[in-house]
């Protein structure tokens, strides 16, 4: 009888221990995301999960085609471990609000008027950057954050080294979450013109790189460093910024832009909408982009008139093409095909690329202005992306004709040469 009671007591004790362990595991899952590790397919929108997985396999197999790019990424990530944290609150100038948590920047192409005693109001000199803008450091802090976090997140995904994830999350917390150093989710005082205004909608072009942060969050989801609380608070920040873009005077002003500014406004709206679960808004924006962005910005022969009118016509044409391609990539996430959209008179993303490609490979000369001269290699990432989409066009061959392309160009990792067995992988 005593033996039976003893066995029952032991059994009961074991059940209690196992129950406690199970509860502890559940609580731990509440603190850390239960979304798989770096070996899982990442939640990304502008990047392509299938291609990232292909690159990781190629890295593990020491594929020579991407080794230079992988080595460069590792060097960049190692350097990023010692950078930051970054914050806009460290600037020496205070915005009109009196709050250094508000982003602030000065219009780069505006200079003192030599005919005015005090130089005011500033006047426009397109394409010529006024070094005075560097007195306000917010745009530099933002650029450094975007580059470092993306680099660290990619390195973590490819290698699984938690050091990279930990540093990336540290930078994200400092810039977006820490009450002492966080940025307020608005650009009310971005790109002000001395003597004219305190801020403009055009400043939203400066946050186009935040879409890289959105994908970086997805790459970090499997890490030990990014908690579910972190992720939710980041989503809350982007949700507020998205709403500010939709409701504010500056946001509405940028939405109405008919050039690259309008394109990148849409890219941001869609990316942030997908992050916070507003898929209907993302789909609506993309459907409207057919006419609002592609049909109105691209001519039947592929020219982009509003970009060609600039003093850096090549850079702006290439940059807007990249933005249109980003919209098309985002369209894949919600079933809106912009890659193959074409108006009755032939306006399309493809035509815009085909207009620039002959210049990049040296078959034609650039007939428009470009301060400092064109850089043909800048079109390489777009051509590489097109090689995956338009398989009936020899963009893979054309890429080999673009001069001065760095073998360590990151696009080789983001859009790798897939092996024959993977040619039908999802775009």
Predicted regions and their residues:
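Flexible internal linker/loop segments at domain or repeat junctions
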Residues: 287-308
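Extracellular glycan-targeting catalytic surfaces
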Residues: 31-254, 263, 287, 298-299, ...
């Amino acid at each position: 009888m005593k033996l039976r009671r003893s066995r029952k007591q032991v059994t009961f004790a074991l059940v209690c221990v196992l129950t406690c362990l199970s509860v502890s595991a559940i609580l731990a899952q509440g603190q850390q995301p239960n979304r798989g590790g770096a070996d899982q397919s990442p939640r990304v929108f502008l990047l392509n999960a299938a291609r990232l997985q292909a690159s990781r396999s190629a890295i593990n197999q020491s594929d020579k085609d991407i080794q230079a790019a992988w080595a460069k990424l590792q060097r960049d990530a190692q350097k990023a471990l010692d950078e930051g944290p970054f914050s806009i609150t460290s600037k020496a100038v205070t915005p009109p609000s009196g709050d250094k948590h508000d982003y602030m920047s000065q219009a780069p192409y505006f200079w003192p008027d030599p005919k005015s005693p005090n130089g005011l109001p500033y006047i426009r000199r397109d394409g010529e950057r006024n070094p005075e803008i560097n007195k306000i450091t917010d745009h530099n802090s933002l650029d450094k954050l975007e580059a470092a976090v993306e680099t660290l997140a990619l390195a973590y995904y490819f290698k699984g080294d938690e050091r990279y994830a930990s540093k990336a999350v540290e930078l994200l917390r400092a810039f977006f979450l820490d009450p002492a150093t966080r940025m307020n989710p608005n650009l009310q005082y971005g790109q002000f013109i001395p003597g004219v205004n305190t801020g403009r909608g055009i400043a939203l072009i400066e946050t186009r790189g935040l879409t890289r942060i959105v994908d970086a969050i997805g790459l970090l989801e499997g890490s030990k460093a990014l908690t579910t609380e972190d992720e939710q608070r980041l989503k809350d920040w982007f949700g507020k910024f998205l709403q500010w873009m939709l409701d504010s005077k500056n946001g509405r002003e940028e939405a109405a832009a008919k050039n690259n500014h309008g394109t990148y406004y849409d890219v941001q709206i869609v990316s942030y909408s997908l992050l916070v679960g507003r898929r209907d808004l993302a789909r609506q924006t993309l459907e409207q982009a057919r006419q609002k962005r592609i049909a109105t910005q691209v001519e039947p022969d592929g020219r982009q008139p509003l970009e060609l009118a600039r003093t850096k016509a090549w850079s702006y044409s290439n940059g807007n093409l990249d933005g249109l391609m980003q919209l098309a990539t985002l369209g894949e996430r919600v079933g809106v095909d912009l890659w193959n959209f074409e108006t009755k008179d032939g306006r399309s993303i493809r035509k815009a690329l085909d207009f620039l490609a002959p210049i990049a490979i040296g078959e034609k000369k650039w007939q428009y202005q470009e301060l400092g001269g064109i850089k043909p290699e800048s079109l390489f990432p777009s051509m590489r992306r097109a090689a995956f989409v338009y398989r009936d066009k020899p963009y893979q061959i054309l890429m080999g004709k673009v001069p001065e392309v760095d073998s360590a160009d990151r696009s080789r990792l983001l859009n790798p040469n897939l092996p024959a067995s993977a040619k039908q992988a999802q775009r």
